[in-house]
Amino acid sequence: MKKPYSIGLDIGTNSVGWAVVTDDYKVPAKKMKVLGNTDKSHIEKNLLGALLFDSGNTAEDRRLKRTARRRYTRRRNRILYLQEIFSEEMGKVDDSFFHRLEDSFLVTEDKRGERHPIFGNLEEEVKYHENFPTIYHLRQYLADNPEKVDLRLVYLALAHIIKFRGHFLIEGKFDTRNNDVQRLFQEFLAVYDNTFENSSLQEQNVQVEEILTDKISKSAKKDRVLKLFPNEKSNGRFAEFLKLIVGNQADFKKHFELEEKAPLQFSKDTYEEELEVLLAQIGDNYAELFLSAKKLYDSILLSGILTVTDVGTKAPLSASMIQRYNEHQMDLAQLKQFIRQKLSDKYNEVFSDVSKDGYAGYIDGKTNQEAFYKYLKGLLNKIEGSGYFLDKIEREDFLRKQRTFDNGSIPHQIHLQEMRAIIRRQAEFYPFLADNQDRIEKLLTFRIPYYVGPLARGKSDFAWLSRKSADKITPWNFDEIVDKESSAEAFINRMTNYDLYLPNQKVLPKHSLLYEKFTVYNELTKVKYKTEQGKTAFFDANMKQEIFDGVFKVYRKVTKDKLMDFLEKEFDEFRIVDLTGLDKENKVFNASYGTYHDLCKILDKDFLDNSKNEKILEDIVLTLTLFEDREMIRKRLENYSDLLTKEQVKKLERRHYTGWGRLSAELIHGIRNKESRKTILDYLIDDGNSNRNFMQLINDDALSFKEEIAKAQVIGETDNLNQVVSDIAGSPAIKKGILQSLKIVDELVKIMGHQPENIVVEMARENQFTNQGRRNSQQRLKGLTDSIKEFGSQILKEHPVENSQLQNDRLFLYYLQNGRDMYTGEELDIDYLSQYDIDHIIPQAFIKDNSIDNRVLTSSKENRGKSDDVPSKDVVRKMKSYWSKLLSAKLITQRKFDNLTKAERGGLTDDDKAGFIKRQLVETRQITKHVARILDERFNTETDENNKKIRQVKIVTLKSNLVSNFRKEFELYKVREINDYHHAHDAYLNAVIGKALLGVYPQLEPEFVYGDYPHFHGHKENKATAKKFFYSNIMNFFKKDDVRTDKNGEIIWKKDEHISNIKKVLSYPQVNIVKKVEEQTGGFSKESILPKGNSDKLIPRKTKKFYWDTKKYGGFDSPIVAYSILVIADIEKGKSKKLKTVKALVGVTIMEKMTFERDPVAFLERKGYRNVQEENIIKLPKYSLFKLENGRKRLLASARELQKGNEIVLPNHLGTLLYHAKNIHKVDEPKHLDYVDKHKDEFKELLDVVSNFSKKYTLAEGNLEKIKELYAQNNGEDLKELASSFINLLTFTAIGAPATFKFFDKNIDRKRYTSTTEILNATLIHQSITGLYETRIDLNKLGGD
């Protein structure tokens, strides 16, 4: 008979733990066959293990490289097109001119002709450089001089303009005499006022252009502009934005209440990434503000570049650059003279030493302008007479180069103006320039619209181009060959993501009116008002509608005060005194109907409010989100030419939105509940007395939304696992974990020979970058100070406290309770806090809620009354008025107050308890549901006569806190640092808990088993059933001694026996840990180009048309190895070149991979091997496993390096010691420190275990001796240092790459294994994904007969 079993999975982003569990919570062992050429034929293995792998990465790096390649290719193409236009005429003047230019990079012996690139002779070349020291001298000369000039010089000037053509951020015409600093400042103020509540800077109408374009320091500019706004503080938010705008570094930590610094500076290369990180914390709605600040900054920069006021020149940019050049020359002469006189001993360092940040380093290119200025300031600061230099440095106008970071602020129109001037002058002498003027200008002005994408011919994964013809695309025929409209449609389809819940529906733009309306109602539906009588209630449908029309349509940002004013006017009879449920910190709604306010400035209000126009408005916002290109916006808005005026279209063109929502129109306002025919938005607007929000509506079993979503998520073919997993929404890292877990399940089912009863899944949460939780704890003191002040207490004056100390919850609760016992009102003594109890308002018997909201400080838990319910009525009667004061001062939340006073409303009801059950059990994360769905569809394929699924395999999803609670309860401590077994143990405990819960509470099955079951309602069941388990935390049965059986009398849980089994499994020394072998992909080598030298190790930068010898041109080093190969072949030895058979490891780089795979034998012969036979080549990807003497294992890192391959196993008591050592810093839990103190002698035993392990497997004798000496010198005086040192010591024994660690504050350097010779005669172990199947190859036996 087939024995039933369950599979447990613990899925993470770089590991998957797995376990097979039988009915009595044991893990079976199987005798597994071993293939290969060793004496081992079978090994008994426990069906318990973990797969470790490098986590999946996003495609960002690949994308950045791809776009850079395209940019350079297109730039090169522009130059080739220009040469094509010039070629015929240039042939008459100098037919080898273009060849010489192309060869200018090459060393003399590699050139095809003369070594002087422009004129081909030294004399003319020298004269040219004297006349035109920079290209800008030539550009101005050609633009302003009416005489005929050598055609070669005309080409050089135009090629420079076309190569570095400026940015395209400004559309249409651009006046170089007026670059709009004032207008852009006004635009910035408008966005600023829109973004921040109660800001009206725009109204002050100040003139700033003169200040911002003046030659004064950045700080002076900021200060002068700030003075024009008398109400703005010098350390305020507006001042911080001014810092940014003038080009200084700003830090928004304080202004957005962030935990860490948030520095931003427009001139930094990392600006884009730093802004992205900031917006991830504060919200995308600030993106437009930073964009308008950046436009203003660029415009100020440009005014600093275009410094020439000479109206006569037709080349203002070139003239400004010449002025910069001349100033540089004069200032350099002055600086040299000054340093000779005042600092003669420093002269050589400044002007000759390239390694320093002086002038030599600056001109060489190693030192940037910022570092050079810093160096000079340090040198000149206290020297008399250096004021001139320091003043220019302060203005950032000293010894400036021609090519600097701020050249990025030059619009292409300025270059175009110079190009036209040059062509106009020279076309008189070269008519072909006039004939081809449009084509030449097009080379400068034409850009491939981003919505057309790459111009590939159907061979690229990244192209979506639609063509009208197969001809080659050039800047001049683009509109004839490319179907822009179809390409734009395809772009829309690629750009928009799919809904998380309805995977075949596209999401709405973030600024869609429908989406914004949804977010407003979703937030509003959970806001409660409080009346004078102390009654609290949700807003009804009528009030919500009135608030939406009267507040959200009137104010862009809705604050608590604005809503209160409205309610006082419109709902005076309700006597509303307070609101709860808003963002506590800022007292504002996070949601806004902002797009409505934007469109109100352009379109008629009646048009916006007319429901018939909803579709049109959604399409307009979609267009404004997808396209920045005004021409395309105009084209798409032509569909509404009968509704929109030309003026309105013009205004809409300038409006651009960014960002996407996460939900589709179909989900929000498409699918309807079967009975009521209402959509989700309809329910948010009017939900009777329930006032459910979005998450509650889609998870409510009484409505059909849940069923509709489940139906929409059914996947088709499940055989192609890669496709199935790639289609779900989630990061590459978590998808990689999911894919591996599905493969593991397949292998386990194959080994067991039949399907499991249950598959229990738990998924790790990814580290998402959210500041909310951390910000809350970081801001404890700030919030406390305000509330204590409101409460009218002196407690903070009497007992001052630092924010860091408030991380101790006991102390924090003391202040939140104003130093009094929460249940008696008596004073507590701050010096004896450790003797008081922390009590859970809702007992832990029902739910593990350790939040501040569920805990109070009391002199004794007895003070609460009954221990199995909320605090008693007597306590409530006595303390309610005190609690109310705490609530008014915001020292406690409404939720805490409601729970404290619950007894007067009958205490905990059955419904409450049903809710607790759900919160503990029901995994709400969508990604986990996706995994459950995939497993369900792979294993449960049969249906009954009613077409209902027959679920033979139950897919159980568990919340991760169930396992951690279970571990704590039975002291099954987890210390990740010891080894990787904890992944397997978590999977095992998941299976245990899932299996036991299913047995003990079959009626709870629908809550955590995937599928369409009738759901359980606590209050609808008969009272006896409800009582049976509802009066407890669902995990409590594990602790009780009574035996639990199922309806057939089978034992499900027998505490002593089963806990004993569990402990036994967790102490198994044999757990199958597999490090996934992976072929390396990506770049060929490190990216730095190294200078030429005699090294043979350099890789040439070019090999195709022309070979760039690394001895002449330098090259790359550190090629990335795709995989290694073990080869047995002959090599020639000694002078006689006698053949000798060798066994060797050869690294195959990513660059060589294709050559090797095409013909391995020829590849190795080129490397000097002879008599190579394919059967004597073994491919070894990274992390291949080798076994050596005494069970020592090594992983292959590369052909030249190994890593550690053994896992240390510790006895239970040492695991317990390390658990407490790891948590010793927790002030709230003194038991950890006590335990370590009592058992500190066990660290000696731990060191012995590590020492024995190290001698056998790690083999780092020097390090081991150093560790022992340090332990002897520091024998446990400082317990915290002792504890952290031994946690760090586990790095020494950990599997994988060796790493440096600290032991008693001294660095223990890593011991690298840089010889791979020892594995050539070891046993190679090929493992399957679970490690249960193995092929062992004794490399000693290879290569013989």
Curated annotation (Swiss-Prot):
EC number: 3.1.-.-
Pfam family, one: Cas9_PI
GO molecular function: DNA binding; endonuclease activity; metal ion binding; RNA binding
Entry-linked InterPro entries: Cas9, Cas9-BH, Cas9_PI, Cas9_REC, Cas9_RuvC, HNH_CAS9, HNH_nuc, RNaseH_sf
Signal peptide interval: none
Residues annotated as the enzyme's active site: 10 (for ruvc-like nuclease domain), 840 (proton acceptor for hnh nuclease domain)
UniProt keyword terms in alphabetical order: Antiviral defense, DNA-binding, Endonuclease, Hydrolase, Magnesium, Manganese, Metal-binding, Nuclease, RNA-binding
Subunit description: Monomer. Binds crRNA and tracrRNA.
Family designation: Belongs to the CRISPR-associated protein Cas9 family. Subtype II-A subfamily.
Function: CRISPR (clustered regularly interspaced short palindromic repeat) is an adaptive immune system that provides protection against mobile genetic elements (viruses, transposable elements and conjugative plasmids). CRISPR clusters contain spacers, sequences complementary to antecedent mobile elements, and target invading nucleic acids. CRISPR clusters are transcribed and processed into CRISPR RNA (crRNA). In type II CRISPR systems correct processing of pre-crRNA requires a trans-encoded small RNA (tracrRNA), endogenous ribonuclease 3 (rnc) and this protein.
NCBIfam families xrefs: cas_Csn1 (TIGR01865)
Protein name in the entry: CRISPR-associated endonuclease Cas9
Gene: cas9
